[in-house]
Amino acid sequence: KTGTLTQNKMVVQQVRSAAHQYQISGEGYDPKGEFLEQGLGVSPQNSPELWMLLLNALLCNDAVLQQERGEWMILGDPTEGALTVVAAKGGINPAATTATVKRLVEYPFTSERKRMTVVLNAADEALFQYLPSTWGATPYLLFTKGSPELLLDRSSQAMVNGELRPLDEQL
C-alpha cells in the first residue's frame, strides 16, 4: 500500500501471492482500477489465489466504502479502507459481500497478537468457489491479516494456481 500525500488517502498499488505479483491501477478510494501482471490485464475472478486474497482483504476488515455526492470515501481505518477498495477493484461488491457472508467470531488486531482474525460462514459457493476440494464442504472459513513475518511463521501451505502446496523457501 502507499499513501497519497496530496489526497491523504491510502491506496493499494501492488499485491503478491506465493507465485504472482500484481500491479493495481486507480487513485484514491474510487473502486475503478485494473490488475496487471507483467503488464498484462488479469481478471481476479480467474485467479484463485488473487480472488481469495481479495476476499480476505475485504472480509477481515471493518472499513466501509461509500459514495457521497459523487465522491468515494471510507468510514474507518485508512489501511482497512485501502484493502476494501482493492477488493472492489477486483470485482467484489463490498456491501453485498459483507451482507451475505456472516462473521461468526472476530479476534481484533492487538499490538500483542499483531494480527486480526475472523471466522466466517462460507456457505456462499460462488464467492468461495476456489476453496480447495480437499477441504470438503466446510461451512466455515478463517481469514487473518497482520504482520507478514508472523503469519508466514505460522503457515504451512500456500495456494498456487488454485492448489495448496507446502510453504517452503522456493515460494
Predicted feature locations:
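Conserved cytosolic headpiece of P-type ATPases
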Residues: K1-L171
